Amino acid sequence: MQKWWFTHNNRSIRRKSTIKMRIVLAALVLIIAPALLWGLIDIYRSANGRPCASFEEIKQKYAVSDAALLDRNGEVIHTLRVDVHGRRLDWTNLGQVSPSMVRATLRVEDKRFYSHGGIDWLALVSATFSNLTHKNLRGASTITMQLTSILDRKLRPRNGSRRGILQKWNQLKAAVSLDNHWTKDQILEAYLNLITYRGELSGICAASRGLFNKEPSGLEEAESLILASLITSPNASVEEVAKRACRFASPVSRNSIRDMAYKTLGRPYHIRRDASIAPHVARLLLTNGKKESKCTLDGNLQRYVHASLNEAVRFLENQNVSDGTALVVENKTGDILAYVGNSGTSPTTLYVDGITAYRQAGSTLKPFLYELALEKKLLTPSSILEDSPLEIVTPTGLYVPHNYDNIFRGPVSVRTALSSSMNIPAVRVLGLVGVTDFVERLQELGFKGISQAPEFYGYSIALGSADITLYELVNAYRTLANNGRFSNMRLVFDGNRHHAQNILDKKAAFLISHILSDRQARSTTFGLENHLSTRFWTAVKTGTSKDMRDNWCVGYSDTYTVGVWIGNFSGEPMRNVTGITGAAPVWLGIMNYLHRGFTSKPPQPPGGVQSAQLTFEDSIEPPRTEWFIAGTEPAGMVLVNRVHAKPRITYPTQETLIAIDPEIPQHLQRVPFRFEPQSRRFTWTLNKEKIGTNDSVYLWTPKQGVHELAITDEDGHILDSVTFLVR
């Protein structure tokens, strides 16, 4: 009896509990059902509401992280990273994504994407039940829902936590609205372009190129599964990504997918830039948030110049050459057509812009010195200069210039001296022109680095002791090509022509161009066959700075000016490299490339310039037809001493102190007495006693004491005298 009573009582209790549970559930249904119904109505009512933006607006607002530099023809010649917060490449249309990538994305993220209306209710209910029972925590966000949180910042989780109920609710509403206004393909295309795959790689193009070095259209199944498996957790470990990818792969491909995941994700990503030939111009122009900028460069020419420079520097590596730069400009417009600031051969100097770096000018400034002398009518192309030993007393000591080859050629014409780049005649010309006037002229030509007082440079500026840039030098030579008219060069089409002003006399500029184009005149130093000789008209000058640290070649045709520098950005000297062997071959190659379809014609003589037939005294140079500024042409034969200064003793100078070397027997020591010009007949006297006649250099055995040295002419008149001390 007792057992029956307990059994009956338990059944009664269970029945009552079941009834209560049903009542509670019924109550919950009665309470929740209207709420759910209201919620569903609210969600689908939002379908008529406009989403945060249209597909076209999102695509238009999309910004790549790399800005593009376009050449004059619209070709992308360089891309430059301008956004450091994410790596985004070009927007990829859905049709440009491989089918395997589309399938993998849908399989991993949203297998019923094309059948639901923005919300996968089946997945949502299943995920809710799993989360409530704690069996398997998972999400149920569709591709559409994920996209809404990308498009609307308010729908994203805050501070790394999960979304709140209200935020999730708004996401559901936004997904339905988006699905109602966008096509499925538009949603999927935007999703693939906006999601983050790995680290800073955002969008399918950056992920595909960064991880697999291929365009999205070329992605294969294994690569696609790895990328799709990154979406849920972009920064997950390689092991987690590989495990997730294998879960969606066929059994036979899992090992290869795992190996690929470890190989691909276990190394830093790298995006290869096909367009990377103008880095220095890109850094100049792609500023202030610009995503695109068109410049004056010619892409094909830029590639050729860079390749030529790179090849030349590598060829000279054994002569301690590491770097090179080149600049090409159109004479008439000032458009810069090629700007190669670095040959790219030295990894330690890849970011150095050698075009704007200051280097010693060498002989490249001589044409402007001679132009000023011609302009002032102090000289003509046929004037005779003495190429002989020279010593100049300066406030800082004795200045003794030398020719590059240490050969003295005696009397030479201005044409020969400039074309053959003789140093001592150039210093003599500077003595005629004046250091101050020459420095001021260089400043007028845009040499901003020449900013010190004239006395800072002294006579050495004639031989290029001043620091200049290739940019400044090319524009100065372009001024010669434009008959003396100076204007700024340009890298962008700004719509305005830069104002031109007359800096050089057009008649003198014509004479300089004629001299620099004279193959015969330059043969004295360089020979007839060299890298300065072109099959069309060009005017060109080389330069080499002290200790072979800088190597220049700058010249122009009727259309283009080209400048090349070879050397070391570190300042180390080269070994046995001159302008004719270093920079000139590159210059010649560029000129030939520029004129492969047409020729270059010599400039027409301007008004006020005329030619005349002339001969030289003692036949120091062959007879020729020479050009002159009207009124400066010689009457008949050119005399050797036409432009000589007053005869003088060049060594020792006044009050020179000479010390006898105690280590060397006195009778073996010699002091050279020097005099110029050498063409005169004269007599050496020391302490009023005759010691020699017509010796350009007299070697004297020194004796202690104060001595008076003089030179006298045939009539005994003192031409020059100095007092010096020996101790």
Residue map of PLM features:
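Non-catalytic, structured segments within soluble enzyme domains
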Residues: 35-39, 136-306, 440-454, 459-464, ...
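Short, well-structured active-site flanking segments
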Residues: 114-124, 202-205, 351, 374-394, ...
